[in-house]
Protein backbone atom coordinates (compact mmCIF):
# COMPACT_ATOMS: atom_id res chain seq x y z
CA UNK A 1 0.00 0.00 0.00
CA UNK A 2 1.40 3.40 -0.99
CA UNK A 3 1.13 6.49 1.18
CA UNK A 4 -1.37 7.91 -1.27
CA UNK A 5 -3.76 5.01 -0.67
CA UNK A 6 -6.42 5.23 2.00
CA UNK A 7 -6.56 2.46 4.59
CA UNK A 8 -10.05 1.07 5.06
CA UNK A 9 -10.59 0.25 8.74
CA UNK A 10 -13.29 -2.16 9.89
CA UNK A 11 -14.63 -0.50 13.01
CA UNK A 12 -16.55 -3.67 13.90
CA UNK A 13 -13.24 -5.52 14.38
CA UNK A 14 -14.52 -8.59 12.53
CA UNK A 15 -12.42 -11.75 12.43
CA UNK A 16 -14.38 -13.63 9.77
CA UNK A 17 -12.41 -16.38 8.05
CA UNK A 18 -9.58 -16.28 10.57
CA UNK A 19 -8.39 -19.18 12.72
CA UNK A 20 -7.41 -18.33 16.29
CA UNK A 21 -5.34 -20.60 18.52
CA UNK A 22 -5.93 -19.66 22.17
CA UNK A 23 -3.96 -21.30 24.97
CA UNK A 24 -5.41 -21.53 28.46
CA UNK A 25 -8.78 -21.53 26.73
CA UNK A 26 -10.63 -23.88 29.08
CA UNK A 27 -11.29 -21.18 31.67
CA UNK A 28 -10.72 -17.62 32.80
CA UNK A 29 -9.29 -14.99 30.48
CA UNK A 30 -8.50 -17.54 27.77
CA UNK A 31 -12.12 -18.71 27.65
CA UNK A 32 -13.37 -15.12 27.50
CA UNK A 33 -11.04 -14.32 24.60
CA UNK A 34 -11.97 -17.48 22.71
CA UNK A 35 -15.68 -16.67 23.14
CA UNK A 36 -15.18 -13.09 21.99
CA UNK A 37 -13.24 -14.18 18.92
CA UNK A 38 -15.99 -16.64 18.02
CA UNK A 39 -18.63 -13.89 18.19
CA UNK A 40 -16.50 -11.92 15.74
CA UNK A 41 -16.48 -14.77 13.24
CA UNK A 42 -13.21 -16.57 13.98
CA UNK A 43 -12.82 -20.32 14.15
CA UNK A 44 -11.34 -21.31 17.48
CA UNK A 45 -8.66 -23.82 18.38
CA UNK A 46 -9.10 -24.00 22.15
CA UNK A 47 -5.82 -25.28 23.59
CA UNK A 48 -5.37 -26.26 27.22
CA UNK A 49 -3.66 -28.73 29.51
CA UNK A 50 -7.22 -29.68 30.47
CA UNK A 51 -8.28 -31.40 27.25
CA UNK A 52 -11.86 -32.01 28.40
CA UNK A 53 -12.21 -28.37 29.38
CA UNK A 54 -10.88 -27.23 26.01
CA UNK A 55 -13.30 -29.49 24.17
CA UNK A 56 -16.19 -28.33 26.35
CA UNK A 57 -15.38 -24.70 25.66
CA UNK A 58 -15.21 -25.37 21.93
CA UNK A 59 -18.60 -27.07 22.06
CA UNK A 60 -20.13 -24.11 23.91
CA UNK A 61 -19.07 -21.70 21.19
CA UNK A 62 -21.62 -23.09 18.74
CA UNK A 63 -21.34 -22.18 15.08
CA UNK A 64 -21.11 -24.58 12.17
CA UNK A 65 -20.08 -28.16 12.79
CA UNK A 66 -16.31 -28.31 13.17
CA UNK A 67 -15.93 -24.53 13.43
CA UNK A 68 -14.27 -24.86 16.82
CA UNK A 69 -12.14 -27.62 18.29
CA UNK A 70 -10.41 -28.40 21.57
CA UNK A 71 -6.79 -29.56 21.74
CA UNK A 72 -4.61 -30.82 24.60
CA UNK A 73 -1.25 -29.17 25.20
CA UNK A 74 1.33 -28.73 27.93
CA UNK A 75 2.87 -25.40 26.95
CA UNK A 76 5.94 -26.09 29.11
CA UNK A 77 6.82 -29.08 26.92
CA UNK A 78 8.32 -28.27 23.51
CA UNK A 79 7.16 -31.51 21.90
CA UNK A 80 3.60 -30.99 23.16
CA UNK A 81 3.57 -27.44 21.83
CA UNK A 82 4.79 -28.50 18.40
CA UNK A 83 2.27 -31.34 18.28
CA UNK A 84 -0.58 -28.99 19.19
CA UNK A 85 0.45 -26.39 16.60
CA UNK A 86 0.71 -29.10 13.95
CA UNK A 87 -2.68 -30.56 14.92
CA UNK A 88 -4.39 -27.17 14.74
CA UNK A 89 -2.83 -26.42 11.35
CA UNK A 90 -3.85 -29.85 10.06
CA UNK A 91 -7.43 -29.39 11.30
CA UNK A 92 -8.01 -25.83 10.10
CA UNK A 93 -5.41 -25.42 7.35
CA UNK A 94 -4.02 -22.20 8.80
CA UNK A 95 -3.44 -20.19 11.99
CA UNK A 96 -4.04 -16.45 11.71
CA UNK A 97 -4.16 -15.46 15.37
CA UNK A 98 -2.31 -16.75 18.41
CA UNK A 99 -3.20 -15.86 21.99
CA UNK A 100 -0.93 -17.09 24.76
CA UNK A 101 -3.10 -17.00 27.87
CA UNK A 102 -1.94 -20.14 29.69
CA UNK A 103 -0.24 -19.24 32.94
CA UNK A 104 0.27 -19.89 36.65
CA UNK A 105 1.05 -17.82 39.73
CA UNK A 106 3.17 -19.40 42.47
CA UNK A 107 3.36 -16.80 45.23
CA UNK A 108 5.69 -16.67 48.21
CA UNK A 109 8.20 -14.32 49.82
CA UNK A 110 11.36 -14.31 47.71
CA UNK A 111 13.44 -15.90 50.45
CA UNK A 112 10.96 -18.76 50.78
CA UNK A 113 10.03 -19.51 47.15
CA UNK A 114 11.03 -23.05 46.20
CA UNK A 115 13.15 -23.73 43.14
CA UNK A 116 10.38 -26.00 41.90
CA UNK A 117 7.86 -23.14 41.99
CA UNK A 118 10.35 -20.79 40.35
CA UNK A 119 11.10 -23.26 37.56
CA UNK A 120 7.47 -24.17 36.90
CA UNK A 121 6.41 -20.52 36.76
CA UNK A 122 9.11 -19.64 34.24
CA UNK A 123 8.51 -22.83 32.26
CA UNK A 124 4.78 -22.23 31.83
CA UNK A 125 4.52 -18.45 31.68
CA UNK A 126 7.70 -17.53 29.82
CA UNK A 127 9.05 -20.59 28.02
CA UNK A 128 5.52 -21.71 27.15
CA UNK A 129 4.79 -18.37 25.54
CA UNK A 130 8.04 -18.43 23.57
CA UNK A 131 7.63 -22.04 22.45
CA UNK A 132 4.11 -21.44 21.16
CA UNK A 133 5.14 -18.19 19.46
CA UNK A 134 7.99 -20.03 17.77
CA UNK A 135 5.90 -23.00 16.63
CA UNK A 136 3.00 -20.91 15.34
CA UNK A 137 5.11 -17.95 14.26
CA UNK A 138 6.99 -20.07 11.73
CA UNK A 139 3.69 -20.91 10.03
CA UNK A 140 2.58 -17.28 10.11
CA UNK A 141 5.84 -16.14 8.54
CA UNK A 142 5.48 -18.73 5.80
CA UNK A 143 1.90 -17.56 5.20
CA UNK A 144 2.97 -13.92 5.12
CA UNK A 145 1.04 -12.62 8.11
CA UNK A 146 -0.55 -13.11 11.49
CA UNK A 147 -1.32 -11.51 14.84
CA UNK A 148 0.00 -12.67 18.20
CA UNK A 149 -1.37 -11.48 21.54
CA UNK A 150 0.58 -12.52 24.62
CA UNK A 151 -0.87 -12.14 28.09
CA UNK A 152 1.52 -10.30 30.39
CA UNK A 153 0.46 -8.47 33.57
CA UNK A 154 0.76 -5.28 35.55
CA UNK A 155 3.44 -7.41 37.23
CA UNK A 156 5.48 -6.83 34.07
CA UNK A 157 5.64 -3.11 34.90
CA UNK A 158 5.91 -2.86 38.68
CA UNK A 159 7.17 -5.01 41.53
CA UNK A 160 4.49 -6.89 43.46
CA UNK A 161 5.03 -8.37 46.90
CA UNK A 162 5.53 -12.17 46.89
CA UNK A 163 5.45 -12.23 43.08
CA UNK A 164 9.16 -12.66 42.34
CA UNK A 165 8.76 -15.61 39.95
CA UNK A 166 5.55 -14.26 38.44
CA UNK A 167 7.07 -10.80 37.88
CA UNK A 168 10.18 -12.35 36.34
CA UNK A 169 8.06 -14.41 33.95
CA UNK A 170 5.82 -11.54 32.90
CA UNK A 171 8.66 -9.05 32.47
CA UNK A 172 10.12 -11.75 30.25
CA UNK A 173 6.93 -12.13 28.23
CA UNK A 174 6.97 -8.42 27.41
CA UNK A 175 10.65 -8.60 26.46
CA UNK A 176 10.21 -11.64 24.24
CA UNK A 177 7.18 -10.07 22.58
CA UNK A 178 9.03 -6.85 21.76
CA UNK A 179 11.92 -8.78 20.20
CA UNK A 180 9.52 -10.87 18.12
CA UNK A 181 7.67 -7.73 17.07
CA UNK A 182 10.94 -6.20 15.90
CA UNK A 183 12.05 -9.34 14.04
CA UNK A 184 8.72 -10.33 12.52
CA UNK A 185 6.85 -7.05 12.00
CA UNK A 186 8.46 -6.46 8.63
CA UNK A 187 7.32 -9.90 7.51
CA UNK A 188 3.66 -9.35 8.36
CA UNK A 189 3.44 -10.83 11.85
CA UNK A 190 2.45 -8.43 14.62
CA UNK A 191 3.18 -9.24 18.28
CA UNK A 192 1.65 -7.34 21.19
CA UNK A 193 1.00 -7.89 24.89
CA UNK A 194 -1.88 -7.17 27.25
CA UNK A 195 -1.04 -6.40 30.89
CA UNK A 196 -4.11 -6.58 33.15
CA UNK A 197 -4.58 -5.89 36.81
CA UNK A 198 -6.40 -8.52 38.86
CA UNK A 199 -9.11 -10.00 36.64
CA UNK A 200 -12.30 -11.31 38.22
CA UNK A 201 -12.20 -14.83 36.87
CA UNK A 202 -13.23 -17.66 39.17
CA UNK A 203 -9.66 -17.85 40.48
CA UNK A 204 -9.45 -14.07 40.73
CA UNK A 205 -12.54 -13.96 42.91
CA UNK A 206 -11.16 -16.62 45.23
CA UNK A 207 -7.74 -15.01 45.53
CA UNK A 208 -8.85 -11.42 46.03
CA UNK A 209 -12.18 -11.50 47.86
CA UNK A 210 -12.17 -9.87 51.28
CA UNK A 211 -9.90 -7.33 53.00
CA UNK A 212 -6.84 -8.11 50.85
CA UNK A 213 -8.71 -7.31 47.68
CA UNK A 214 -10.35 -4.25 49.19
CA UNK A 215 -6.93 -2.88 50.12
CA UNK A 216 -5.59 -3.39 46.61
CA UNK A 217 -8.62 -1.77 44.98
CA UNK A 218 -7.95 1.38 47.00
CA UNK A 219 -4.64 1.68 45.12
CA UNK A 220 -6.37 1.56 41.73
CA UNK A 221 -7.64 4.97 40.56
CA UNK A 222 -10.78 3.45 39.03
CA UNK A 223 -11.43 1.66 42.33
CA UNK A 224 -12.07 -1.84 41.01
CA UNK A 225 -10.60 -4.91 39.34
CA UNK A 226 -11.06 -5.85 35.67
CA UNK A 227 -13.59 -8.25 34.18
CA UNK A 228 -12.63 -11.01 31.72
CA UNK A 229 -14.64 -9.50 28.88
CA UNK A 230 -12.73 -6.22 29.23
CA UNK A 231 -9.52 -8.11 28.53
CA UNK A 232 -11.22 -10.00 25.70
CA UNK A 233 -12.32 -6.73 24.09
CA UNK A 234 -8.71 -5.57 23.94
CA UNK A 235 -7.65 -8.92 22.52
CA UNK A 236 -10.27 -8.65 19.78
CA UNK A 237 -8.97 -5.25 18.73
CA UNK A 238 -5.31 -6.29 18.74
CA UNK A 239 -6.09 -9.37 16.64
CA UNK A 240 -8.18 -7.45 14.13
CA UNK A 241 -7.00 -5.75 10.95
CA UNK A 242 -7.95 -2.43 12.56
CA UNK A 243 -4.80 -2.83 14.68
CA UNK A 244 -2.53 -3.33 11.67
CA UNK A 245 -0.24 -0.50 12.79
CA UNK A 246 0.07 -1.73 16.38
CA UNK A 247 3.16 -3.86 16.87
CA UNK A 248 5.36 -4.31 19.92
CA UNK A 249 2.90 -2.52 22.20
CA UNK A 250 2.01 -3.43 25.78
CA UNK A 251 -1.62 -2.52 26.47
CA UNK A 252 -1.94 -2.02 30.23
CA UNK A 253 -5.47 -2.57 31.55
CA UNK A 254 -5.11 -1.79 35.23
CA UNK A 255 -7.38 1.14 36.01
CA UNK A 256 -4.32 3.33 36.42
CA UNK A 257 -2.56 1.25 39.10
CA UNK A 258 0.87 1.47 37.48
CA UNK A 259 0.80 5.24 36.86
CA UNK A 260 1.22 6.06 40.54
Curated annotation (Swiss-Prot):
Pathway: Carbohydrate metabolism; D-threitol degradation
Keyword terms, alphabetized: Carbohydrate metabolism, NAD, Oxidoreductase
Binding site for NAD(+): 21-50, 170
Family annotation (Gene3D superfamilies): NAD(P)-binding Rossmann-like Domain
Catalytic activity line of the entry: D-threitol + NAD(+) = D-erythrulose + NADH + H(+)
EC class of the enzyme, as a word: oxidoreductase
Enzyme Commission number, as recorded: 1.1.1.403
InterPro entries: NAD(P)-bd_dom_sf (IPR036291), Sc_DH/Rdtase_CS (IPR020904), SDR_fam (IPR002347)
Effect of inactivating the gene: Complete loss of the ability to grow on D-threitol.
Family classification: Belongs to the short-chain dehydrogenases/reductases (SDR) family.
UniProt function note: Catalyzes the NAD-dependent reversible oxidation of D-threitol. Involved in the degradation pathway of D-threitol, that allows M.smegmatis to grow on this compound as the sole carbon source. Does not catalyze the oxidation of xylitol, L-sorbitol, and L-sorbose.
Protein name: D-threitol dehydrogenase
The organism of origin for this protein: Mycolicibacterium smegmatis (strain ATCC 700084 / mc(2)155)
Gene name in the database record: dthD
